[in-house]
Design a protein with these regions (language model features):
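Beta-strand/loop substructures that line and gate deep hydrophobic ligand-binding cavities in soluble
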Residues: 81-132
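Hydrophobic ligand-binding cavity/cleft-lining segments
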Residues: 1-40, 45
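Glycine-rich portal/gate segments that line the openings of hydrophobic small-molecule binding cavities
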Residues: 37-84, 132-144
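Generic structural detector for well-ordered beta-strands
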Residues: 6-10, 37, 53, 66, ...
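Short, surface-exposed coil-to-beta transition loops
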Residues: 2-4, 60-64, 86-90
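Short structured motifs
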Residues: 3, 35-37, 75-76, 88-90
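A short, compositionally biased micro-patch
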Residues: 10, 29, 70-71, 96
Length: 144
């Protein structure tokens, strides 16, 4: 399953990347993340691995986040792995004006086991949740 979302944020590209990459900011724009534990590598750099505990609608899930590549502002590629799900996310930040940035997020999910069968009806839910998260980052960044 693949999809893309984008949003325009009224802050500079450098500021939005700094906010995006700072784990201390997660509570402000990703409140469903209940814990963030850095496991290895240099935080935010290729090869870094983090364990996340995320409060989903019906239960808490644990996943790992691996930084695949970091070429800001063009692409920050992250891979998220949980039971039956792998999501590779490419985040791109495009300068529209000195204080205006377009954030484009491309998601590529692969599913295994039960999730392979359940994934079809979930696409609109995943897409909406992704966009809601992007709106939360926009709100946080613009209110600072």
């Amino acid at each position: 399953m693949k999809y893309s979302n984008d949003i325009v944020i009224d802050v500079s590209v450098d500021e939005i990347i700094a906010i995006f990459e700072n784990p201390e900011n997660l509570k402000h724009w990703q409140p469903d993340i209940k814990s963030f534990t850095h496991l290895k590598g240099d935080l935010g750099q290729p090869g870094a691995v983090t364990r996340l505990k995320v409060d989903m609608i019906i239960r808490e899930i644990e996943m790992t986040e691996t930084v695949i590549s970091r070429n800001v502002p063009d692409a920050i590629v992250l891979k998220y792995e949980a039971d039956g799900v792998v999501n590779t996310v490419t985040n791109s930040f495009i300068v529209l004006a000195p204080s205006k940035t377009k954030w484009v997020m491309n998601n590529h999910f692969t599913f295994a086991g039960f999730m392979k069968f359940a994934s079809g009806p979930l696409k609109p839910i995943f897409r909406k949740k992704t966009y809601d998260t992007m709106k939360q980052l926009k709100k946080f960044a613009e209110s600072r």
